[in-house]
Amino acid sequence: MAASSEVSIDPDQWFYIYSLERVAYVCERVGSPVMEEAELRRRRRKRPFLTTTHDELELQMEDLVDELYGVDEQGSSSAAARKRRLTAEQVRALERSFEEEKRKLEPERKSELARRLGIAPRQVAVWFQNRRARWKTKQLELDFDRLRAAHDELLAGRTALAADNESLRSQVILLTEKLQANGKSPSPSPAPAEQTAVPAAPESAKSFQLEEGRRLYDAAGSTTTTNGGGGGVAMPAARVAAARAASNDSPESYFAGARSPPSSSEDDCGGAGSDDDYPSSSVLLPVDATLVGDAFEHAVAATVAADEEAPLNSWEWFWN
């Protein structure tokens, strides 16, 4: 009974079993390319977003599509129920449809594309979603390149402006040193608004006075004036008028139409004599005509000096 239960194993079978165990052990310790590829695919399915290369990204997308469509509409999971990959013609048709309208895929459009291409509507939706994500990424790259080019252009312009500024600054320093070497200190020129004009009133008043005196002197003839002794002296009427104006130095003479207060001959002459003994002030003139001329010239010189000290009021006061 015990002998019948024993299983006899051929030596060749023992070698075959040993070889299988040895191969399994070696594969487990070292790893074969087939086992490594299978393990890599298994890990990628568990962690589909840890890789970064383009090929691995495409492989991840394919694995995701396979996982999405691994279950058919009846809910049975099998390898035969997985959807087929898109052909080149189907991809071109989907690309043309995407170029026409990049917005969200409408249900009617999705159903029409799926019916025309012979694929499931869900597969069309997934393809459009992935294609739209790639398009947005491409647009971001284009925008980044455009902004980077604009930044580089602005930076180049700033560098050029800085170089021009430095060149102008060096020229200013060089010119300043040359001016200092020549003994001319650079001073800013005053603004036109700050420059004060010298008033021309004194010159005009002086010219007017001289011209008026010359005109009166040339136009007037020689008149005869008499003194208290009865002697006649020929002298210009202009000088006589100037002498009278100089002798009339009362405050009332400065105001037009003013009347002088009454005065008696006693106050003027100290109570001695009468008007007959002393001639009136209108004929009290020097005998010598040269003295009258000197008095006139002295009055004109005093007026000019007063005009220089008070340029705005002296000539008006004199001629009033």
From Swiss-Prot:
UniProt entry tagged with the keyword Protein transport: no
Ranges of the DNA-binding region feature: 79-139
Location of this chain's protein in the cell: Nucleus
Annotated InterPro entries: HD, HDZip_class_I_plant, Homeobox_CS, Homeodomain-like_sf, HTH_motif, Leu_zip_homeo
Tissues in which the UniProt entry reports expression: Expressed in roots, leaf sheaths and blades and panicles.
Keyword line: DNA-binding, Homeobox, Nucleus, Transcription, Transcription regulation
GO molecular function, a single term: sequence-specific DNA binding
GO cellular component assignments: nucleus
Gene Ontology BP term (one): positive regulation of DNA-templated transcription
CDD domains: homeodomain
Ranges for region Leucine-zipper: 138-182
Pfam families: HALZ, Homeodomain
Annotated spans, Disordered: 181-209, 249-282
UniProt xrefs under PANTHER family: HOMEOBOX-LEUCINE ZIPPER PROTEIN, HOMEOBOX-LEUCINE ZIPPER PROTEIN HOX25
Physiological role: Probable transcription factor.
Family to which this protein belongs: Belongs to the HD-ZIP homeobox family. Class I subfamily.
Protein name as it appears in the record: Homeobox-leucine zipper protein HOX25
Organism: Oryza sativa subsp. japonica (Rice)
Native organism taxonomy: Eukaryota, Viridiplantae, Streptophyta, Embryophyta, Tracheophyta
Gene: HOX25
